[in-house]
Amino acid sequence: KKTLENIFDIETRLFPCLVEMRFLGVRVDEEKAKTFGDTLKKEQAETLKTVKKETGLDVDIWAADSIQPLLDHQKITDYKITPKTGRASITKLYLESHTNKYLKMIAKARQLDKLFNTFVTGILKFIHKGRIHADINQIRSDQGGTVTGRFSMRNPNLQQIPARSELGSKIRELFLPEKGHKWGSFDYSQQE
């Protein structure tokens, strides 16, 4: 009972700070986000255009059945079979680690598509007067949160922006610090 009261006390003291964070939101460069989105879509289209030009095949990057003809065309047989369907299992890891340049291009096109659809469109969808006011979940509930006590976010989920990639860095550049302030990065690993 005492532990539960301690948790309640901590959560209650933290709540006003979270409300203020949500109301303030995060500044976003909307024009830069639109331009970056256009760049991602253009690069994806150019990548798939190269695949078609060099192989003669149109590929739907998310459909294994559409990638199968490319595997056949390139005489690639080292893929795993999905037991349920008996078809090729085309995972992210398989595409990224394969030596075939066309499979690497499909992996790249998938990454560009995911960044655009998950992050750029998510950011643009939730901008209000130059800011994003994401939901910050403090504790586990039907609306989100984690069982470990960490925060989670949604609408959009800013925590899922790739941390260690060049494109992830470009997405982070869309967020602006308050005037007269700078961003900082602090990683308190294993501090739960």
Indicate where each model-derived feature is located.
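Conserved "right-hand" nucleotidyltransferase catalytic core of DNA-directed polymerases
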Residues: 1-170, 176-182, 189-192
